[in-house]
């Protein structure tokens, strides 16, 4: 009988949930759910100096926001816990002591200064820097001497000589490494904390992980983990290394690149929809059959096939994400769009935190004008700017429109119509524009464009009668007067 699929997402709490980490989690989630397997969250927090406050909470909170759930983990428990590495130190100790006893690992007393000098010498000689094995076979007398000096050892894994390590990668097909390319690597640091490669191999085995799907940057760790599996006589899981995510310059996405929004929390704050972010990330390095790009989470689960993970780097296209979020925004009811928009209008000082019923109705109608156009909640601030300014600036194209010979006549006639209106309603505005057409004989662009530009400052925008109605009589007349002079 085939083993049940068990995969894990194992972040370090060294920062908030990044788009790259979210993709790793999402592909593991889809892989597990597609095969009725188990999805596990494990926190790899042994690099205590790099852990940040709130890092773990951010990971879990925003995975949930994206719509993912998990079967085992730090917050839900499970039979293979604990799921936080700093709570598993006794487990690691027992196992690395076993390696020491069997001579498969040894204590290394070299200082950082000695190791650095060794590295510099290798580089100067044109060699690849790696540990040369100086303390591989220390005598008892040497060990006693180092300990008398107060040196604290690390523990290194004894890498087998002249061995090929080959594995069939789910994404890359066959990958091969040679053991002679590796020095004996540290499995326990001087502070007694296991290194990444040792802890990961132990955890993946003890948690019965069947498939390890992770980023391309981990591929050089794989042979080291295979050596540890082999040393204990454990079955090796299947590995899959997903290609890097690159920016539009085809360079690896860097967390330091502030020109691209890269953290899930930021997208939530900007008023993006979790379903759209999920959809976008699911297509970063994976492609479905056909041309369709908009899918629900359930559809992704049903069709996810790891064989369709791309071998080429995944392009992070910010404009495509905006387009995709807009597709989802269009499907939302107005209440949801209002909820996503209001905090940004408050933050920009456009509206107060507390609104009267009349103000609530007005701002709701303003947001409704842009429902189909909005890419994300925060965009409402820029889109609706004309409703919150006394005067408008005219675009270059708009300035050309206002130079037309018919403009003063059209605007004077329209101002007269607006002045006479009892209520600024879209239907009444529409009727007023028709009356101007009848009065002046101007129609089409010669009629509509001067009115649009003079009242809104724009040559394109929402339905004109609706926009003018929401601007209110005073603003509209002031703007018309400014152009008429």
UniProtKB/Swiss-Prot annotation:
Cellular component annotations (GO), alphabetically ordered? cytosol
Q: Which residues form a coiled coil?
A: none
Q: Does Repeat show up as a keyword for this record?
A: no
* A Gene Ontology biological process term: glutamyl-tRNA aminoacylation
Localization of this protein: Cytoplasm
Biological role: Catalyzes the attachment of glutamate to tRNA(Glu) in a two-step reaction: glutamate is first activated by ATP to form Glu-AMP and then transferred to the acceptor end of tRNA(Glu).
Protein known as: Glutamate--tRNA ligase
Q: Which organism is it from?
A: Bacillus anthracis
Species classification: Bacteria, Bacillati, Bacillota, Bacilli, Bacillales
């Amino acid at each position: 009988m085939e083993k049940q699929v068990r995969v894990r997402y194992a972040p370090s709490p060294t920062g908030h949930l990044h788009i790259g980490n979210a993709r790793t989690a999402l592909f593991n989630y889809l892989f597990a759910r597609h095969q009725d397997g188990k999805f596990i969250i494990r926190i790899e927090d042994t690099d205590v100096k790099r852990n940040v406050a709130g890092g773990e909470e951010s990971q879990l909170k925003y995975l949930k926001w994206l719509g993912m759930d998990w079967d085992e983990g730090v917050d839900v428990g499970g039979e293979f816990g604990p799921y936080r590495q700093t709570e598993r130190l006794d487990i690691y100790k027992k196992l690395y002591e076993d390696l020491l006893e069997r001579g498969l690992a040894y204590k290394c007393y070299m200082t950082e200064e000695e190791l650095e000098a060794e590295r510099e010498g290798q580089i100067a000689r044109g060699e690849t820097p790696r540990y040369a094995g100086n303390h591989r076979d220390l005598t008892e007398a040497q060990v006693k001497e180092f300990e008398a000096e107060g040196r604290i050892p690390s523990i290194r894994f004894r890498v087998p000589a002249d061995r090929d390590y080959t594995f069939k990668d789910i994404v890359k097909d066959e990958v091969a490494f040679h053991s002679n390319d590796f020095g004996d690597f540290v499995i326990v640091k001087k502070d007694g904390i296991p290194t990444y490669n040792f802890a990961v191999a132990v955890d993946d085995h003890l948690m019965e992980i069947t498939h390890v799907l992770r980023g391309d940057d981990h591929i050089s760790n794989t042979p080291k983990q295979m050596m540890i599996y082999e040393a204990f006589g454990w079955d090796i899981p299947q590995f899959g290394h997903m290609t890097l995510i690159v920016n539009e310059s085809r360079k690896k996405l860097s967390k330091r690149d502030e020109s691209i929004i890269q953290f899930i929390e930021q997208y939530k704050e900007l008023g993006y929809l979790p379903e759209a972010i999920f959809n976008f990330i699911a297509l970063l390095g994976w492609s479905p059959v056909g041309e369709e790009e908009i899918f629900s989470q359930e559809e992704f689960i049903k069709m996810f096939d790891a064989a369709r993970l791309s071998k080429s780097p995944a392009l992070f296209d910010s404009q495509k994400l905006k387009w995709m979020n807009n597709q989802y925004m269009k499907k939302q009811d107005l209440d949801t769009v209002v909820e996503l928009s209001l905090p940004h209008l408050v933050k920009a000082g456009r509206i107060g935190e507390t609104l009267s019923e009349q103000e609530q109705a007005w701002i709701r109608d303003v947001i409704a004008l842009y429902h189909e156009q909005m890419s994300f909640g925060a965009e409402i601030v820029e889109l609706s700017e004309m409703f919150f300014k006394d005067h408008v600036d005219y675009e270059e194209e708009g300035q050309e429109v206002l130079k037309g010979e018919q403009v003063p006549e059209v605007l004077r006639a329209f101002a007269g119509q607006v002045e006479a209106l009892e209520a600024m309603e879209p239907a009444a505005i529409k009727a007023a524009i028709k009356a101007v057409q009848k009065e002046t004989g101007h129609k089409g662009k010669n009629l509509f464009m001067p009115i649009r530009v003079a009242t809104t400052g724009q040559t394109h925008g929402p339905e004109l009668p609706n926009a003018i109605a929401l601007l209110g009589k005073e603003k509209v007349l002031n703007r018309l007067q400014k152009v008429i002079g």
